[in-house]
C-alpha cells in the first residue's frame, strides 16, 4: 500500500514533541501535511499531502539538524497486514508498486521502535534481514555489495503486523541502527552523566569542530560539575577545567592536577583567568535562565564555545526549547562572529536536550 510520510524515530514518551517539531519545520518550509503519533510508541509520522514532495524533503532536512528525531525516514510504502508466511514477498510486492525513488539502494536496515514492545521484534528483525537482503539483490533493488555512500532502504516494523518502507540519504541520516549510538560507560568516570557529554562531543561536533573546541592544554569551565562526569571528558582530552559546584568533586579528577574546584554559584561565577575555550553546563535549572546565562558568557567573550543541557518541562517541551533558543540565537546573531548551533535530544539524554555552540569568525563561514 502506498504511503507518503516522514517517519521519525524518537525516545518513547517524546512522540508528541517529535510530531510538533515535524509539523512546524516541514510546514514552515512549505511541505504541508499532518502529524500522527501515539504515546510511548517510539516514533511519529508526518504525512505529506503532496507525495511528489517526498524526495525534496529528504534532501532538505538532515536528522542532525533536528531536535527530537533520532532518524528521519522518507516512507513511500506501508504494509498493514504483514503475513508470517511470506514477509519477503510482501516487501517485494510493496516495492514493485512504487516508482523507484532511486535506481538502487546501497544497504538495507530492518528496524523496530526503541520500546519494550520493540525489543520483542529485535531478534526477528535481525534474522529477517538475511533472506530479505538476498531477495532485494536478486530483484535489483540492492547493490551486490554494501555501499554506504548510496541511499539506504529502511524496513521499519512498528509491530509484527505493520511495517513501513522508506529510505534515507547517507549525508542526511544517522548511520546508527535505530538512530541510536550506544556508548560504553568508562568505569573510571565519577558519574554516568559523562555519557551525555561524550555523546554530544562525538555525535554533534564534526572532527574539525572537535579539534577546535577540545584543544589539549585549552581551558574550560564546567558549571554544575559534581561529581565530575563532564569534567572527566574534558580532562581526558588534556583540558584545564574550573569545576563549579557546591557538591563534592571526585578525588581522581583533582589528582590529575588539571582541575580547580570552586564551591560557588554557577550563575554568578566568572572565569578566573580571562576567556576560556569552552563553557559546559549541566545545572538543573529553568531553560530560559540557562539560555540567558550561556548567552552572557558568549556575548561577553568569557567563553569561545559552549555545550550545555536544557532540562525539559513536562509539557510544551518542543515549544520551550524553541523559545529558549530563539532568544539566545537572536543575541548571537547581533555579534560579529558566526555560531554553529545544534540542539539534539541525544540517546543518553533523558528529560533534557543538548546544545552545542561553536564560534567561527564570519570570514571562516
Ligand atoms: C546533573 S548534576 C551534574 C552532573 C555532572 N555533569 C556530572 O557529569 O557528574 C547537576 C549539578 O548541578 C549543581 N548545581 C545546581 N545548581 C547550581 C548552581 N546554581 N551553581 C552551581 N552548581 C549548581 C548541582 O549541585 C549538581 O551537582
UniProtKB/Swiss-Prot annotation:
<keyword id="KW-0489">Methyltransferase</keyword>
<comment type="similarity">
    <text>Belongs to the class I-like SAM-binding methyltransferase superfamily. RNA methyltransferase RlmE family. RlmM subfamily.</text>
</comment>
<keyword id="KW-0698">rRNA processing</keyword>
<dbReference type="GO" id="GO:0006364">
    <property type="term" value="P:rRNA processing"/>
</dbReference>
<feature type="binding site">
    <location>
        <begin position="226"/>
        <end position="229"/>
    </location>
    <ligand>
        <name>S-adenosyl-L-methionine</name>
    </ligand>
</feature>
<dbReference type="InterPro" id="IPR011224">
    <property type="entry name" value="rRNA_MeTrfase_M"/>
</dbReference>
<protein>
    <recommendedName>
        <fullName>Ribosomal RNA large subunit methyltransferase M</fullName>
        <ecNumber>2.1.1.186</ecNumber>
    </recommendedName>
</protein>
<dbReference type="GO" id="GO:0005737">
    <property type="term" value="C:cytoplasm"/>
</dbReference>
<feature type="binding site">
    <location>
        <position position="245"/>
    </location>
    <ligand>
        <name>S-adenosyl-L-methionine</name>
    </ligand>
</feature>
<dbReference type="GO" id="GO:0008757">
    <property type="term" value="F:S-adenosylmethionine-dependent methyltransferase activity"/>
</dbReference>
<feature type="active site" description="Proton acceptor">
    <location>
        <position position="311"/>
    </location>
</feature>
<dbReference type="InterPro" id="IPR029063">
    <property type="entry name" value="SAM-dependent_MTases_sf"/>
</dbReference>
<dbReference type="InterPro" id="IPR040739">
    <property type="entry name" value="RlmM_FDX"/>
</dbReference>
<comment type="subunit">
    <text>Monomer.</text>
</comment>
<dbReference type="InterPro" id="IPR002877">
    <property type="entry name" value="RNA_MeTrfase_FtsJ_dom"/>
</dbReference>
<feature type="binding site">
    <location>
        <position position="282"/>
    </location>
    <ligand>
        <name>S-adenosyl-L-methionine</name>
    </ligand>
</feature>
<keyword id="KW-0808">Transferase</keyword>
<dbReference type="GO" id="GO:0032259">
    <property type="term" value="P:methylation"/>
</dbReference>
<dbReference type="Pfam" id="PF18125">
    <property type="entry name" value="RlmM_FDX"/>
</dbReference>
<dbReference type="Pfam" id="PF01728">
    <property type="entry name" value="FtsJ"/>
</dbReference>
<keyword id="KW-0949">S-adenosyl-L-methionine</keyword>
<keyword id="KW-0963">Cytoplasm</keyword>
<feature type="binding site">
    <location>
        <position position="265"/>
    </location>
    <ligand>
        <name>S-adenosyl-L-methionine</name>
    </ligand>
</feature>
<dbReference type="InterPro" id="IPR048646">
    <property type="entry name" value="RlmM_THUMP-like"/>
</dbReference>
<feature type="binding site">
    <location>
        <position position="193"/>
    </location>
    <ligand>
        <name>S-adenosyl-L-methionine</name>
    </ligand>
</feature>
<dbReference type="Pfam" id="PF21239">
    <property type="entry name" value="RLMM_N"/>
</dbReference>
<comment type="function">
    <text>Catalyzes the 2'-O-methylation at nucleotide C2498 in 23S rRNA.</text>
</comment>
